[in-house]
Every structure is written in C-alpha cells, then in structure tokens.
C-alpha cells in the first residue's frame, strides 16, 4: 500500500471504531476504566477484518498409481490409490483407504458408471445367478 492509501485506510478505521464504540456506549453501561480496552478491541477487530485474506496455494490433484484407462481390464480392476489388482474394489476401498465408491469416483474424477467390479467377474456372477434360477418368478404349486 502507498502512504496515501495507508493514511486514508487508518482514518477510515478510526472513524469506524469511533462510530461502533459510540453506538455501543449509548446503549450499554461501560465503566470509564474499561473504555480504552473496548476501543482497542474494536479497532483490532476491524483491522483484522480488513486485512487481506492469506493466499491459499491451489491443491494439486493426486496422481493415480496406474492410468485410469488401464485400470479397467476384463479380468481385474486396478485400484488408483495403491495400484493393487482386484476382482471387486468396494471392500478394498473401505478397508484400506476408508473411501466409499462415490468418494473414490469423486476423488479421481471418474464417471458415475465407472465399474467397481471387473467385467469378466460380473459376467460370471450374472451367469451363475441365472443358472440357479435367480431373477425368475417362482412357479406356483398346483392345488
């Protein structure tokens, strides 16, 4: 800040402090001995409020252990956090990284339909379920 701007800033700060203290004292009983402390507290609060906010460095995005494109293979799905290969990621994410599938997708900017299970494993489970009759209506017994 230049000296002119700094001087104007200090004058404005003093005026605001005086207005706030005057308004407070007009509605509250303040002993004379506490008045300098009140003025100093109000001035300090205003000075801190007008100080520029600290600049926060942008957060760098984490780098995945493997590329997102290579993480989904037919027989396995690779964890972007640690690089481990799994048939199903959901339990691994919760136990080792404390992440839900939604948190994992959000952290790595993955689409909502990003699989948590290897495609071949999902197909095998689906085929097995159909073979044992899951998903079909039960047949009624004749009475």
Curated annotation (Swiss-Prot):
Keywords carried by this UniProt record: Activator, DNA-binding, Metal-binding, Plasmid, Repressor, Transcription, Transcription regulation, Zinc, Zinc-finger
- Any GO molecular function: DNA binding
Renumbered zinc finger spans (C2H3-type): 79-97
Domain of life of the organism in this record? Bacteria
Mind telling me which Pfam families this protein's record contains? ROS_MUCR
State any GO BP term from the record.
regulation of DNA-templated transcription
Q: What does this protein do?
A: Could be involved in the regulation of exopolysaccharide synthesis.
Q: Give the family from UniProt.
A: Belongs to the ros/MucR family.
According to UniProt, the name of this protein is: Transcriptional regulatory protein MucR homolog
Q: What is the organism of origin for this protein?
A: Sinorhizobium fredii (strain NBRC 101917 / NGR234)
């Amino acid at each position: 800040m230049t000296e002119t701007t700094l001087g104007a800033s200090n004058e404005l700060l003093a005026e605001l402090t005086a207005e706030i203290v005057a308004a407070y004292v007009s509605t509250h009983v303040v002993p004379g001995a506490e008045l300098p402390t009140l003025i100093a507290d109000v001035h300090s609060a205003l000075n801190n409020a007008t100080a520029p906010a600290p600049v926060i460095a942008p957060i760098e995005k984490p780098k995945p252990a493997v590329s997102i494109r290579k993480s989904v293979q037919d027989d396995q799905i690779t964890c972007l956090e640690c690089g481990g290969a799994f048939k199903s990621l959901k339990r691994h994410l919760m136990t080792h990284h404390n992440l839900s599938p939604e948190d994992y997708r959000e952290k790595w900017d993955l689409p909502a339909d990003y699989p948590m299970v290897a495609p071949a494993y999902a197909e095998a489970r689906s085929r097995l379920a159909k073979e044992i009759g899951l998903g079909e209506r039960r047949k009624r017994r004749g009475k």
